[in-house]
């Protein structure tokens, strides 16, 4: 199995720590005036989402995590699991509530997502950067009602709630940035 030395540690590198796959968030090289140099490393556990901080002596190694990012199509939610399919071989995988997390509010059937896999199990799901969703609930925009800054709340078909301009009505399809959860434009 491949290993990574402390001088190869970079943000985003996937390594195994205590038997769990982790992603390095931050790596700081420290050379004290007296004593051996060391690295102070911040990790995110990909299974639990927890952030850990550890120190490693200069030259120590960690095994590489066999983590793969695969583009998959979202199929459906059966109440407990979210089901995804790879486009190449039509293999299906079930992602848990923890793996889907915040992405569930942006998932629409047939959407292409990036799924982080470890040993054949989905660890996390990243929705597309932009999605087109239908407005299912919003107040009617009243002309001249701009005291609130010209936006109103709108509930989308997936259950997500975003702020939209007053001119949008129920039934319209809008483009939303999933990274910030903001309205971008009307869908063309």
Swiss-Prot record:
Organism of provenance: Coxiella burnetii (strain RSA 493 / Nine Mile phase I)
Keyword Protein biosynthesis (UniProt): yes
Similarity comment: Belongs to the elongation factor P family.
GO cellular component, as recorded: cytoplasm
Gene name as annotated: efp
Database matches in InterPro entries: Elong-fact-P_C (IPR015365), NA-bd_OB-fold (IPR012340), Rib_uL2_dom2 (IPR014722), Transl_elong_fac_P/YeiP (IPR020599), Transl_elong_KOW-like (IPR013185), Transl_elong_P/YeiP_cen (IPR001059), Transl_elong_P/YeiP_CS (IPR013852), Transl_elongation_fac_P (IPR011768)
Protein keywords: Cytoplasm, Elongation factor, Hydroxylation, Protein biosynthesis
HAMAP family in the cross-refs: EF_P (MF_00141)
UniProt signal peptide: none
Protein biosynthesis in keyword set: yes
GO MF term (any one): translation elongation factor activity
UniProt subcellular location: Cytoplasm
NCBIfam families xref list: efp, PRK00529.1
A matching Pfam family: EFP
Positions where N6-(3,6-diaminohexanoyl)-5-hydroxylysine occurs in the chain: 34
Function: Involved in peptide bond synthesis. Alleviates ribosome stalling that occurs when 3 or more consecutive Pro residues or the sequence PPG is present in a protein, possibly by augmenting the peptidyl transferase activity of the ribosome. Modification of Lys-34 is required for alleviation.
Protein name in the entry: Elongation factor P
Post-translational modification as stated in the protein's UniProt record: May be beta-lysylated on the epsilon-amino group of Lys-34 by the combined action of EpmA and EpmB, and then hydroxylated on the C5 position of the same residue by EpmC (if this protein is present). Lysylation is critical for the stimulatory effect of EF-P on peptide-bond formation. The lysylation moiety may extend toward the peptidyltransferase center and stabilize the terminal 3-CCA end of the tRNA. Hydroxylation of the C5 position on Lys-34 may allow additional potential stabilizing hydrogen-bond interactions with the P-tRNA.
